[in-house]
């Protein structure tokens, strides 16, 4: 389970967050590669999840004028992560978008 961010694929969202955006872009590339490497050789499942904007201290520091009450909390996101880590989860090599509530193919790199 890899937790990513839109900052890894959208430079316009990442002003003043270069190191963070670069780390998430690298994480996305690593996950795509690992999924391809293990797709037919292992029972390892690889999922990438983007929680989108969450009510965190980091978000509050970056967006000081934003109303935190309009955002989901990490506790809202956690059950989805737990579900994707459970033995019953069968998908691999996919991307989960928490804000839109869907699993899809990995997005193309920016």
Task: Explain the meaning of each model-derived region.
Residues 1-40, 53:
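Catalytic loop of short-chain dehydrogenase/reductase
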Residues 33, 61-62:
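Residue-level signal for well-ordered alpha-helical positions
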Residues 6, 11-13, 63, 81-84:
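Residue-level detector of functional hotspots within protein domains
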Residues 13-14, 59, 108:
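Short, well-ordered secondary-structure micro-motifs
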Residues 44, 48-49, 56, 64-110:
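C-terminal helical subdomain
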